[in-house]
């Protein structure tokens, strides 16, 4: 979720599809600008071409569901954001071997309900409840 200016080299707001490239020629990120603000789905990549993260923006703000990936392509985590860019909804993170690491729910940036933490073989290590 790199900080990419929404203004072009002439001081005008960017509009339409956008791609940024690494020195090796591979795509670093791709998405769309609407009047200088990130909009819709954006994808970010590592310099080997592997996807690093993907998710949505609305009026330049991070919103909706996002997914992050390990270098091996396995999911690193998933989670959502509300319209104020606060964590919201079910969040999950994974160990590098693909096993679930932790899971729980956010409500507008605050942990709520039962959160569970697992070791890398899937065994439940801890449960904690947030109000």
Question: Residues of each region from the PLM?
Answer:
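Glycine/tyrosine- and acidic-biased, solvent-exposed loop/turn segments at the edges of beta-strands
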Residues: 1-131
